[in-house]
């Protein structure tokens, strides 16, 4: 079912619409759970073609969304997340191709063992069922979530942000075309066809048992609302208050390259670094060059007293800066006593998303990787690798920062659960 914008007359009509979407998605999930890998891949291949063929329509729809956002005074970071370019549309199509090429997780036997009574027990991957994805300004999430749920045998209900509705609708049309060509139900990938914010509340209620899990993808307030109000399980994608720690053993050239990429490659993504921590023993040699490099690249640096002393252009940091996801060309910077002090700071101010250490000393790096309690920890690499595509997942539905079921980039495999399959030869329990 392609999504056309619907005018809703009152809460009762909206509830009827949403519950109907839920029932259709539940029926589609039963079909997808039994679909062969070949049929799902045919749909993905058709979606890839449709995205490329429909690029002009997608970009035109996105231009309207961006124009509205500009007129409403959206900041540069928001506009970057909202904007599609020919390269980003092509990357969307390439991501679908990668997802098509990964092994189908459904039906995979992850463990198998035989009991003394002769029974064989297998642990087998199965779809979750119906996934609801609630997201804000990123139109590419429409494609990422749709194709990952399809690959993993799940139906999905997509509720994108009102600011990206036209873009999401154009992308969704391409996904539905792929489902059609492969003979799969169109309700397998459903886009909520209204901007009415009350639709979110209905999704959080689970649509009378139609929704099995909710994935929020957006700012702190959205995720907090979902976690507070959801009556079904949630894969929480929290904000990325990400750190790069520069150890006393760090190579300066490597540190400069990693810090610049981690902060400035794309400032509006959840994997961007937001705080720079520098070992006090490295401050004399590393601090000033790193700060100057960032400022010269157009990044505002907010630092403690030592960082301010290193460069007159540094602005004073407040307590709030250590807890802020800027999603902009701003970074907080602080000198810490050592790796232990860095770990304490990350524990107190981080969001359990992504944190990196730059160090040549293997023992220090191992300590950091072992003790920092984040979904992704990196040694001598940029935090911007916090991305499902970079993990080889093809795409991601989000970065889960909780500890249950899925953690880190949520790809097709993470969108499955399991059942136990037992083979006997007539055994009965004594």
UniProtKB/Swiss-Prot annotation:
Signal peptide: none annotated. Gene3D superfamilies: Aldehyde Dehydrogenase, Chain A, domain 1, Aldehyde Dehydrogenase, Chain A, domain 2. The keyword Cytoplasm applies. It is found in: Cytoplasm. Pathway: Amino-acid biosynthesis; L-proline biosynthesis; L-glutamate 5-semialdehyde from L-glutamate: step 2/2. Its EC number is 1.2.1.41. It catalyses: L-glutamate 5-semialdehyde + phosphate + NADP(+) = L-glutamyl 5-phosphate + NADPH + H(+). One of its GO terms (molecular function) is NADP binding. PROSITE patterns: PROA. One of its GO terms (cellular component) is cytoplasm. The keyword Oxidoreductase applies. InterPro entries: Ald_DH/histidinol_DH, Ald_DH_C, Ald_DH_N, Aldehyde_DH_dom, G-glutamylP_reductase_CS, Glu-5-SA_DH, GPR_dom. Pfam families: Aldedh. It is an enzyme of class 1 (oxidoreductase). One of its GO terms (biological process) is L-proline biosynthetic process. Keywords: Amino-acid biosynthesis, Cytoplasm, NADP, Oxidoreductase, Proline biosynthesis. Belongs to the gamma-glutamyl phosphate reductase family. Catalyzes the NADPH-dependent reduction of L-glutamate 5-phosphate into L-glutamate 5-semialdehyde and phosphate. The product spontaneously undergoes cyclization to form 1-pyrroline-5-carboxylate. This is Gamma-glutamyl phosphate reductase. It comes from Rhodopseudomonas palustris (strain HaA2).
